[in-house]
Amino acid sequence: MKIYSALLLAGTALFFTHPALATVCRNSNGTATDIFYDLSDVFTSGNNQPGQVVTLPEKSGWVGVNATCPAGTTVNYTYRSYVSELPVQSTEGNFKYLKLNDYLLGAMSITDSVAGVFYPPRNYILMGVDYNVSQQKPFGVQDSKLVFKLKVIRPFINMVTIPRQTMFTVYVTTSTGDALSTPVYTISYSGKVEVPQNCEVNAGQVVEFDFGDIGASLFSQAGAGNRPQGVTPQTKTIAIKCTNVAAQAYLSMRLEAEKASGQAMVSDNPDLGFVVANSNGTPLTPNNLSSKIPFHLDDNAAARVGIRAWPISVTGIKPAEGPFTARGYLRVDYD
């Protein structure tokens, strides 16, 4: 009898794969391209109304942006993300309206040659294939037909300057897990909005309050936020005359300041400031849309509004001696 010895070799097959390296792509020129919108000369007496939507002229052509992905990129598809720091206020017909400022909401649609129409903000949208992606060569970011809609939430009066601000920052990546760290292009806006509706405040003259000489030690004795002892608030009545604004309209006046701390306008001496209040002494908080003095126009589209003002210590520290001034602006809005 023969005995056979069998040797059983058992093994586990090992499969080695080469995973695609996730990468963050950049603008081929080295810096992000900015697509800019000028909001000047957009509004008229007809569309300067709450709820009105104004569509800006379409930027129908290609945005003209090329991107390049870094060494190690092995795929030929990309994702795009459209990020905004502005809050979404509402969605209407797929358009996501962002709060641009106290007067306007804004929304956009963008068309990609492969992905079609989409409505930012939105992250990691899968786009088409371009074989330059994996070869570290420039490829087109195929965005076009940019549609920008503006919605009025508060009508303008007089002139309002809209400082330049970024609406969307656009990133190109090769996976949905990549950090959104290197912008490829941005979409921004600014403008100077001037409308037929206007109100003249104090006949266009500066409203001045002069409190004379005040002892420096009185401010530190009063403490932060308080008026020095012996200083009396001053009262003035402001005449307002409106044009192209309906008689009997309900309006409001608020305070804007170059530098503010709480309820005070900070002066050119940082330890000192001024408080402006309504006729009853309730302070206005500078640069706060909800802090206002409501008033009612008469049959001649005019009104008279009382305000009070007084100096205060901002820090509670004894200030340096010398004159101090602060400048603010009285803005009239629809209430």
Curated annotation (Swiss-Prot):
It comes from the Bacteria. Belongs to the fimbrial protein family. The keyword 4Fe-4S does not apply. It is found in: Fimbrium. This is Type 1 fimbrin D-mannose specific adhesin. InterPro entries: Adhesion_dom_fimbrial (IPR000259), Adhesion_dom_fimbrial_sf (IPR036937), Adhesion_dom_sf (IPR008966), Bact_Fimbrial_Adh_Pro (IPR050263). Coiled coil: none annotated. GO terms for cellular component: pilus.
